From Swiss-Prot:
The entry's keywords: Ribonucleoprotein, Ribosomal protein
Protein name (record): Large ribosomal subunit protein uL29
Gene Ontology biological process terms in this record: translation
Cited InterPro entries: Ribosomal_uL29, Ribosomal_uL29_sf
Signal peptide: none
Origin superkingdom: Bacteria
Primary gene name: rpmC
């Protein structure tokens, strides 16, 4: 997921992306707990993408729209 592409999305799309990432993180954690997860790097990638989306949502809430 690219930060530039995320910045182009509106608030509703960001919230949908957040829900999708949270579901994906939950599924990956369940797979890891059962010993079925083979690609452990996906957990880190999803966590990073969650942080990006949350950061952009908070920027919009605070009225900052940094386009750079």
């Amino acid at each position: 997921m690219n930060l530039k592409n995320l910045r182009k999305k509106n608030k509703k799309e960001l919230n949908n992306e957040l829900l999708n990432l949270l579901r994906e993180q939950f599924n990956l954690r369940m797979q890891a707990g059962n010993g079925q997860l083979q690609h452990t790097h996906l957990l880190k990638e999803v966590r990073k993408n969650l942080a990006y989306v949350k950061m952009l949502i908070n920027e919009e809430k605070k009225g900052r729209n940094n386009n750079g």
